[in-house]
Amino acid sequence: MFGFLKKNFLDPHQEKSGNGWIARLKSGLARTGSQLTGLFGRGGKIDDDLYEELETILITADVGMDATNALLADLRRYVREHHLSEAAQLKEALAHCLLKLLKLLKPLAQPLQAQDQIKTHKPFVIMLCGVNGAGKTTSIGKLAKYLQGQGLSVLLAAGDTFRAAAREQLAEWGARNNVTVIAQQGGDAAAVIYDAIQSAQARKIDVVLADTAGRLATQAHLMEEIKKVKRVIAKALPETPTSPAAPHEVLLVLDANTGQNALSQVKAFDQALGVTGLILTKLDGTAKGGVIAAIARAHPIPVRFIGVGEGLDDLRPFVAEDFVAALLGLDEQ
């Protein structure tokens, strides 16, 4: 029944170095899996109390009401159609419903195709945004490493000019990756990124990663400022007959621990910037991770990467099957 979850979905690079990474993902999402194991393993009949407990587990895992209701409706339908009565039998029913959940998540699992993009977009400009503390600057360092692993040259733009620590942190990531960082103390964010793009063109760099200052979606003046940054980026690298204007990718970085607040962040930043992809960070901590299912239903924007640690290799492409297996603790069933 769970054979579809046992398949190894890692790419060859992940197979070499990903075992510990996948283990950290499972560990970070273990709370939900252990709760489900306890619910199904204690025996008893399938009744309204059992469904209510399952609903609570899913909601507290940040799956959200909409996605939870859809999953439970499918589960109840399956139980009726197959005349199931024992709690332990819900594993089979849940596996059936997971197949539908995978269909929901699979369209979101769209890896960043930078190698293909630079054939017509060079430099390929990636703008990163998000609230304070989501892990933007750290994600840029990891993303630089990931892109270098694909044989691409990278330049970093220190567009978070509000925090000196952000420039220093980006410089540190640049040193660790042997990547040039363009920064100005007290400079204008748009000007810094503009200069970085010009520098990348002169050096024939493949990819520019542009950091921006963290901001709350409710801070209207700061949201207007980041719109200006995007407009300036478009002026630095305007549309051509073969390429759209930069930025070619707008990545929103989300802290997995923010739960349902992530939905409002996605909505606000997408309205302001036209978000093309998401990075979900900090899945190695207390994150419950079900918010991805909620995002899939409310704002189906591709999840490009998920992160589970501080190491350079701890940012990986999102694989729906691996994620759902780890989230629901069913990979070993």
Regions found by a protein language model. Give the residues of each.
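Non-catalytic terminal/linker segments enriched in charged/polar, low-complexity residues
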Residues: 1-127, 149, 154-155, 176, ...
